[in-house]
Amino acid sequence: MTRGWAIALACGLIGTGAQLAALAPADLAAQTTNTGVSVERLLAAPIITPDLHPSIGENIQGPSVIRVPDWVQNPLGAYYLYFADHKGTYIRLAYADDLLGPWRIHAPGSLQIADSYFLTAPPEVEPERAARLRAQPTNRGHDSFVEATTPHIASPDVHVDDENRRIVMYFHGLDGVSRQVSRVATSSDGIQFEARPEPLGRTYMRALQHDGYTYIMSMPGQFYRSLDPLSGFEEGPRLFNPDMRHAALLKRDETLFVFWTQVGEVPERIYLSTIDISGDWTAWAETPSVEVLRPEFDWEGADAPLEPSVRSTAYGHVNQLRDPAILEDPESGRVFLLYAVAGESGIAIAEVHFDD
C-alpha cells in the first residue's frame, strides 16, 4: 500500500502570467548553497496572512499542502493547505486552484481538538509543580505555566493515500502537563477527519515512504518506522541535535533531503542536510548543514531585532523563518518550499532548484 502514496504532491499550473510578471528581480531573490540547491521566492508577499479571514487569528504556522485527488467529490479547490495556530484548537484549512493563490479560508477548518483525543481543558497541576512553573522567568512572552498547560493541536503533516482513497494527517497536541505527543487522523474528503487514539511518538512528525515502510522523523531528528502508516511505530535512530526544531522531507532515490530550522539561531533560518537512506536505518547519518533561506524582507521578519529564537510559540513579528514544508510536482519535477514567516505571522512559498 505504501508505494501508492502521493506525498504532499502539487501539480497543475503554478501562478498566472500576471502574478509572475508583477515580481521585480529583487522579489525573486534566490539563495544558493554549495550543494547545488537554491531556493527562489515566488512572490513578494506571503500567500497566507491574518487578513485572509478573521477566523484564523494572528498566529499562523505549520503548513502542509496536498493536491486534492480526483476521487474527492466536489472539492473546494485544486489544493488544500493545512496549517495551525501554535496554541489553537483546530487545524486551519485554506484552498486554491493555483499554488500562488488566491487562497481562501474554509472557516470551519478541518480536524477539531474535541475529535483529536487530546486534552480540551488544561490539566490539573500539583501545587508544588505549579509553583515551580510559575516561578520561572518569562522569556519573550513565554509563560512556563501557560506553555505547559494550554490544550492545542498543531503541526499537520498531510498525505494522500490513493490506494486506500484516504487522506492521512499526522498532528500533535497536549497529552498532559508539559507532555505533547503525535497522533494520526484520516479523511475521505480532506475536510472531516477521524482521529485515532494511539500515541505514535514525539511531536512535529514528518512522514515518507521507503522500502515498504512508513518512516517518520519527529523533533528533534527522532526516526520511527512501521509497516502500517497508522499504527505500531518502532523507535529508531536520533539524528541532528537537541536544538533542531521543524523539518520537511524530500526523498530522491536513496537520498533524503531534510530542510530544517534550529532553536537559538540569530536569526532562525532554514538549513538543508541530506541522509543516505540506502542502508540499515540504524546507520543513517545526516550531512553537515548548509543554509538555504533566511529572512531578507520585512514581511519575512528582516526588519525585526536580531535575537535568539526560543522554543514554542513565536509571539508577534520576529526575525525568524520556521516550519519548512515541501511540495513536489510529479509531472514537472518542480519542488516547492512553503515556510512560516516573521516567526509565525504568515506562510510564504518558494521554489527549490537542483543543479541536476
Segments (PLM) and residue ranges:
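Beta-rich carbohydrate-recognition and catalytic domains
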Residues: L28-H317, E328-D356
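Iron-sulfur (Fe-S) cluster-binding modules
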Residues: L321
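N-terminal secretory signal peptides that target proteins for export/translocation
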Residues: M1-R3
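Low-complexity, intrinsically disordered tandem-repeat tracts enriched in small residues
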Residues: A21-A29
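Bacterial N-terminal signal peptides
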Residues: A8-A22
